[in-house]
Amino acid sequence: MIESYPIACLQANVRYIMNPAQKKEVISQNLNRGLELIDSVMRWGGRPKIVTFPEFFLSGFIGVSAKNIDEYRQMSIQIPGDETDVLAKKAVEHGIYIAGGNYEVDDDWPGRLFLTVFVISPEGKVVAKNRTLNVTSSTFSIASSPGDFLSEYVAKYGEDALFPVIDTPLGKLGVASGDMIWPETVRGLVFKGAEVILGCCTGGVRFMFREIAKVRAMENMAYLTVCGAGRILGSPVPETWSSGDSTIVDYKGKVIAQTESLDEAIIVADIDVNQLRKERSRTANNMLAMIRGDIYGPLYQKLEAWPSNRWNQKPIQSTEEAKVVIKEVLERLYNKGTLTRPS
C-alpha cells in the first residue's frame, strides 16, 4: 500500500530571455531561484515527495522575443542537459521527483523546437518527457508537435511516448503542459495508467486552468496539479500576464490546495493514491469504466480536423504556415456541417 504523501507546486517568478546573448545569465537566475524554492519547501513545507514548476520556468516564454526559429532554438535547452543536471542533483539531495517544462532542442531532430515537460527522479534521471501535442495547431507557436511528423516520431519512440506515464513508488505519474486544456491530453495519460498528473502551466486567463483542472480531475478520477507561473520579469509584457493561481485537485474534482496570487507562492497538499485506487474500483458511476470508446472513436476518426505529418519533411518556420492549415481545416469542417459559417 502507498502511504499518503505531500506534493508541492512552486509558483516561481520567471525572468524572460529577450535575446540569445542573455540566455546563460537569465537561465542561471531562474534556475538558482528554483533551487532556493525547493530548499524552502523541503525545510518549511512538509517535505513533499514531488515538486512541480511552471512551463518555461527556465527560459520564460521566448515567443515574446524570438524573431525566428533559429533564435527560438538558440534560447532553448536540451533535456537532459546542463540545466536538468543541476536539478537532478537537487532531486538526489532531497530524494524527490521534480517536474517542470521548457523549450527544448534535441540533436536527434535537427532544426526542430519542442515545448517539453519533464520529470526527474530521486535517482537524478530524466524519467519522462512529454512533448506538447497541441502547439503548432494553436497558430501561436512554432514549436514542433510530435504530430507534425507523427509517423517518424512513433517509429523512433513508440506510441507510448505520446502519452508518457511512469510507474513509481508514489503511484503512476503523468506530466502535462498547458496542453491539458484539451480533454484528450489528460485522458490519454489516464488511459496509459496515470493516477497523478503533474501539470506545468504558464499563461492564460486567470482561473482558467483551475476550472479546467477540476473537470479533468473529476472526469478522469485522477489527482491533478496546476503549477502556474508567478510574475513575468524582464519582459515588455505586463508582469501579471502569467497564470498564477496554482492549484491541486483531488480525484473527485475538489480543490485541496490553491493560491489566488499572481506573485511567487508555494502550495502543498497530500496525495492518497490508495484511496484513489479504491475510488476507481467503485461500481456506481465509475467515470473510466463507463467510457464508450467504440461509440466515440469513429467520431474522431471521421472528423478530419488538424492533420498529422504536415511538417514531416521540414519543421514549421512561421506561424503563418499554421494559419494556412487552420483555414483549410475550417473549410473542411464548414463543408461537412460540423461548423457553421458566421454571418
Identify the residue ranges that each predicted region occupies.
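Active-site catalytic loop in hydrolytic enzyme cores
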Residues: 106-195, 205-215
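Acidic/histidine-rich helix-loop elements
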Residues: 15-29, 76, 141-151
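Conserved hydrophobic/aromatic positions in well-ordered beta-strands
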Residues: 8, 118-120, 247, 267
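CN hydrolase (nitrilase-like) catalytic-core segments centered on the catalytic cysteine
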Residues: 79-99, 171-270, 278, 287
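Cys-nucleophile CN-hydrolase/nitrilase-fold catalytic domain and related Cys-dependent amidase chemistry
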Residues: 25-28, 35-132, 137-138, 203-215, ...
